[in-house]
Structures are given as structure tokens and as C-alpha cells.
């Protein structure tokens, strides 16, 4: 029997399961130049964005991760998305990812919502380690992870190709303290 999808809350945000009506907001985010500049995926149509919605659902179904729609607690407005993927039960680790619509940047929503995600990973899933892979040039994301007490472990130089050029990724990690 499947567990009920967890709803996570803080003072200003609610993290909930994606619903079909989120499609337009996910498309808005994953087609926005300021988001996709550092994000690994982008879409050019609502129809193509359905692939991402399926990915969100498949993560949970296949127990390889869980992503939430990040929403305003006040009015339910969609702010962005965040979650865990690439879960390894054997190694008790996962990868954190997140993005916010640009109009929500600089308002503390990410700093408020991401502890809900990693605490869920540590306390409910039983993870020992949560990793974040960040393009070396993405200063805003690196600052956000540092504020959340993720430690920079190193840089994988020229490890991926994006737009026909090699990019480097910084590896950040947070390890559960027991």
C-alpha cells in the first residue's frame, strides 16, 4: 500500500504534490531564460512540459525521489519546485534540486523551504547524505546552499557538456548529525 504524499509546511510556504493545474507554472519556470541558464533541462511547449510532470510522478512511484510544488502558504500561489532525486537506499544518499520563479527570488522562500526537504530526507527517508551539484558559475545557488550549511566538497572540472561547451560542477553535501 502506498503512503500518502507528504505535505510539508513552514511559516510562509507549503510543499505539496504536483497537480495537473501546475503544468503552466512548471512550463513558465522551465522555459524562463534566467532559470534554465543553470538548470539541466528546459521545455519549449506546454505539451513537452508534460514530460517533466511525468518525471515528478515517476520519482515517487519508482521510489527514486520526491519533488514538491513550493507554494505560498498565504494564497496558494505557485513559487517553484524542489525535492530529492537519485535516491540510493543502499548508500543512504540523495541529490537535492530546486528552482523558483524569478519573481520569487531574494525573498527567502528557498532558504525556508529547502530545510523541509532535507529534513524529510534525513528523518523520513533515512538518508545519511544529501548532495547538490551546482554549475561553478551559479553564484546564487552556491550562496543558498552555503546558507543552508551544505559544505563545498570539491569541483568536478569539465565534467559535462552544455551548449557545446564543457562545464564544471561544484559538489555540496550535507550529512546528517546524529
Predicted segments, located by residue:
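A generic secondary-structure signal
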Residues: 55-59, 120
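Conserved GNAT-fold acetyl-CoA-binding loop/helix
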Residues: 34-55, 66
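Short loop/turn motifs at secondary-structure junctions and domain boundaries
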Residues: 58-64, 150
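Acyl-donor (CoA/ACP) binding surface of acyl/acetyltransferases
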Residues: 1-33, 67, 71-178
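Intrinsically disordered, low-complexity regions enriched in Ser/Pro/Gly/Gln/His and often acidic
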Residues: 11, 48, 60-61, 92
Amino acid at each position: 500500500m502506498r503512503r500518502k504524499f507528504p505535505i510539508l509546511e513552514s511559516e510562509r510556504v507549503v510543499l505539496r504534490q504536483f497537480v495537473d493545474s501546475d503544468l503552466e507554472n512548471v512550463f513558465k519556470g522551465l522555459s524562463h531564460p534566467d532559470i534554465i541558464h543553470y538548470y539541466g533541462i528546459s521545455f519549449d511547449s506546454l505539451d513537452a512540459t508534460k514530460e517533466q510532470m511525468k518525471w515528478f510522478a515517476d520519482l515517487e512511484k519508482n521510489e527514486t525521489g520526491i519533488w514538491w510544488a513550493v507554494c505560498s502558504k498565504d494564497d496558494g500561489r505557485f513559487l517553484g519546485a524542489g525535492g530529492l532525486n537519485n535516491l540510493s537506499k543502499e548508500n543512504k544518499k540523495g541529490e537535492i534540486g530546486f528552482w523558483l520563479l524569478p519573481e520569487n527570488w531574494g525573498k527567502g522562500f528557498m532558504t525556508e523551504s529547502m530545510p523541509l526537504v532535507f529534513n524529510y530526507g534525513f528523518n523520513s527517508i533515512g538518508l545519511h547524505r544529501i548532495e547538490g551539484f551546482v554549475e561553478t558559475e551559479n553564484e546564487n545557488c552556491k550562496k543558498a546552499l552555503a546558507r543552508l550549511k551544505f559544505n563545498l566538497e570539491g569541483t568536478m572540472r569539465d565534467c559535462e557538456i552544455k551548449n557545446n561547451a564543457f562545464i564544471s560542477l561544484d559538489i555540496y553535501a550535507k550529512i546528517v548529525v546524529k
